[in-house]
Amino acid sequence: GACRMCVVEFEEGGPPGQQASCTIPVADGMVVNTKSEDTTELRKGIMDLLISEHPHGCLNCHRIDLCGPADICLRHVSVNDRCVTCPKNERCELKDTVRYMEMDLDTTLTYNNRHIPLKVKDPMWEMDMNLCIVCARCVRVCDEVRGDGALAFTDRSGRSLIGTSNGTSLLESGCEFCGACIDVCPTGALVERDHKWDKAVKKITSVCTHCPVGCQMTLEVDKRNRLIRAIPDRHAAANQGQACFKGKFGLEFVNSKARLRKSLIKTDGELAET
């Protein structure tokens, strides 16, 4: 409920006024309005505040409709504000939401870079708190879905950020490195270290082969036909959007040059392609 972008109005069976739907359990008799005029305007106001916590030079640039996914603007947007310098460029939920809401981002709010060092000491992933909008998704999925509680709100010079409760590394905090926080992060604040800057050109639905559970995954493949990212399928019956550290990060064996890519059969002591 920290970002409050899921605000709705209850016509029947719920509390009055706009409420964050993610904090209210579903009950019989509820009638919910998700797109009333007041609710839509409130969401836009909330979004305006959220992007003030994130580099948004490209989001409210008047040339956004003419800008391609790989263009680098040298006239209107500073280096630190550009979407192309973010590892989640063109797969950023924040940008997608701005486009979906058709927002007119003539905001007077400015983003001040926090100059927080990139956290790279933990294995397999990186944390950039300069891109965090403190939506609390990572904290909630770690606590409520994974039951881990490795992430928590922290304070830095009076500003709320995300970290560990005791200021330790994630490895020391008991993190399972399942990657659930990365999957729910709407910005580039939490990303996989491997293939961080690689862009996917196609997606494939497959099943994780590390164990017999049968977790369904969406695999992202780059233009060189390398597997660069695995995202758990939230609609799959076996895993319901979750994965273990092997399923999320154990991908490099697929890209190995020594990997067998065709079936072989041994005949007279010699292996031959079938």
Sequence positions of predicted segments:
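N-terminal export/assembly segments and adjacent metallocofactor-ligating motifs
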Residues: 1, 11-15, 29-274
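Structured interaction patches on ligand/partner-binding surfaces of diverse proteins
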Residues: 21-25
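Acidic, glycine-enriched active-site microenvironments
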Residues: 6
